[in-house]
């Protein structure tokens, strides 16, 4: 039997360095700060750290606008700081995964600065340029951050494409020289000892070369999972990822199961695994992110069923509730009030019981919440500020917009990590770049470590279960009680064992009936989120946000 790749039974911890730990008084996190917290991460027992971009960047989009792929931004430290962090992590058995953005570069990148204003620059064809159409933009594609996806270069009269901010110019992957540069960048970091790469919005790199107008949407159907995407990924995988033995995870925007079965194929011909976001759109009524609505629980279960069954035996998924672009999960699908701790544990158990590689976003393991900012000036996020202006222009009241941002802004997850009850949550001795959530005196890592019943130790238990029981990695997926409006229950089967996971997603009790085919079997409780959970699988009344994981012998 072939050996399971390390990442299939791993749990990965995502660090947003700007908000993790400041080693001084700058107010922004840095590499030395991460290094100072490695023992905390070792206590949690995660296998790898994914760092969001720490490359040289003007920080228009918090580092996802890279101006130099081969150097560390001075805000985070130096290359020797990075090398020291890598060595210190490896010494603790923790791998490092770097975030790489190759759909676009910053307009401050040397390639773009050479290309701008000069049609004859050797770097002009590194980007996507089009002539005006009818005296205006080349087509009606929209930027993900609002407005047209095209920006005029006045010196040449041509427009360049930017699917994100105008300071993020899209690279032209049709140009073999661009693909060669990407391979060189990956080689550079792999040679330093980096263990893996997270590829930002990687399924957007292949554009329909006709660049047609979109009569029904914002243009995304012409560049999402585009015509040459699989060819491009196989090329990079064959030439660099496979030879250096790197783990790769692709962020897939608005993708499909069929594409992800290929992106994350078990033969590793493209990537190791994929992130998809369908489950985090269940509170976008009519597809509208910028609205405030309860999440659609039945749809959440349906989506996970579709992906768990569809990827089993074909491809590998990354499992996650949170990241630096999403609100805090306990605020979103759980409870910020009296049930916060059990709700955070329930959400963790439900996700970690699934097949795939779980990702924990910094602070998730202590049940951090959205900050509940009351003023637009508290927000730093470019997307949030743009939406505020757009909604105001549409006539929406400030209170309504702030309520929406309070639920959906990317800054909800970017507030400083809450280390202790000390000033600024122990994040910095200076002025933090983003205001910490006001609840840090109660919700912080120091308090969590001291309390054996905290969310932190529940995550630690889940990580230990995944290492101890191969069924977490290997089992298939079958949903139970499909139409139940409160309970998400599923079984996973492998090697004569059955894993039963039962979760109440609401603050009211719910009656759970053990299915007849599972009755009478021997089983043991692996983990509950109340101190007196039933030891054997049985019908029971689930308490608010109660979650139970049982292992049964068939």
Question: Where on the chain are the PLM-derived regions?
Answer:
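Active-site and adjacent substrate-binding regions of carbohydrate-active enzymes
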Residues: 1-554
């Amino acid at each position: 039997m072939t050996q399971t790749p390390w990442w299939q039974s791993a749990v990965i911890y995502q660090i947003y360095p700007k908000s993790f730990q400041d080693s001084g008084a700058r107010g922004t996190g840095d590499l030395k700060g991460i290094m100072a917290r490695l023992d905390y991460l070792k206590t949690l027992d995660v296998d790898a750290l994914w760092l969001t971009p720490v490359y040289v960047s003007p920080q228009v989009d918090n580092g996802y606008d890279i101006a130099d792929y081969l150097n560390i931004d001075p805000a985070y430290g130096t290359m020797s700081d990075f090398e020291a962090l890598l060595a210190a992590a490896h010494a603790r058995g923790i791998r490092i995964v770097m975030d790489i953005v190759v759909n676009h570069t910053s307009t401050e990148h040397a390639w773009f600065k050479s290309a701008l204003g000069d049609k004859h620059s050797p770097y002009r064809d590194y980007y996507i340029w089009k002539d005006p159409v009818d005296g205006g933009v080349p087509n009606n594609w929209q930027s993900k951050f609002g407005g047209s996806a095209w920006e005029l270069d006045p010196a040449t009269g041509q427009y360049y494409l930017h699917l994100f901010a105008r300071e993020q110019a899209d690279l032209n992957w049709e140009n073999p020289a661009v693909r060669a540069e990407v391979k060189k960048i990956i080689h550079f970091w792999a040679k330093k000892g980096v263990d893996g790469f997270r590829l930002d919005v990687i399924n957007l790199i292949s554009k329909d070369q006709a660049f047609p107008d979109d009569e029904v949407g914002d243009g995304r159907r012409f560049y999402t999972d585009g015509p040459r995407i699989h060819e491009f990924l196989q090329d990079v995988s064959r030439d660099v990822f496979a030879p250096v033995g790197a783990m790769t995870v692709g962020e897939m925007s608005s993708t499909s199961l069929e594409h992800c079965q290929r992106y994350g194929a078990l033969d590793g011909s493209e990537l190791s695994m994929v992130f998809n976001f369908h489950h985090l759109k269940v509170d976008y009524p009519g597809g509208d992110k910028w609205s405030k609505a309860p999440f659609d629980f039945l749809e959440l279960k349906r989506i996970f069923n579709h992906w768990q069954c569809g990827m089993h035996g074909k491809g590998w998924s990354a499992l996650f509730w949170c990241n630096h672009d999403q609100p805090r999960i306990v605020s979103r699908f759980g409870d910020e009030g009296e049930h916060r701790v059990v709700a955070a544990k329930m959400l963790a158990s439900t996700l970690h019981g699934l097949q795939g590689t779980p990702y924990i976003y910094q602070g998730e393991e202590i049940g951090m919440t959205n900050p509940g900012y009351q003023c637009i000036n508290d927000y730093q996020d470019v997307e949030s500020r743009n939406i505020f202006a757009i909604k105001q222009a549409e006539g929406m009241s400030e209170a309504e917009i702030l309520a929406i941002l309070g639920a959906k802004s990317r800054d909800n997850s970017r507030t400083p990590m809450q280390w202790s009850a000390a000033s600024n949550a122990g994040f910095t001795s200076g002025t933090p770049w983003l205001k910490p959530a006001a609840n840090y005196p109660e919700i912080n890592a120091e308090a969590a470590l001291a309390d054996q019943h905290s969310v932190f130790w529940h995550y630690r238990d889940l990580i230990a279960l995944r290492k101890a029981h191969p069924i977490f990695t290997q089992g298939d997926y079958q949903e139970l009680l499909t139409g139940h409006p409160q309970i998400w229950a599923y079984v996973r089967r492998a090697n004569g064992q059955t894993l039963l996971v039962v979760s109440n997603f609401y603050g009211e009790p719910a009656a759970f009936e053990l299915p007849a085919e599972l009755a009478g079997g021997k089983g043991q409780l692996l983990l509950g989120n109340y101190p007196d959970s039933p030891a054997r699988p049985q019908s029971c009344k689930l308490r608010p946000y109660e979650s139970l994981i049982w292992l049964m012998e068939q």
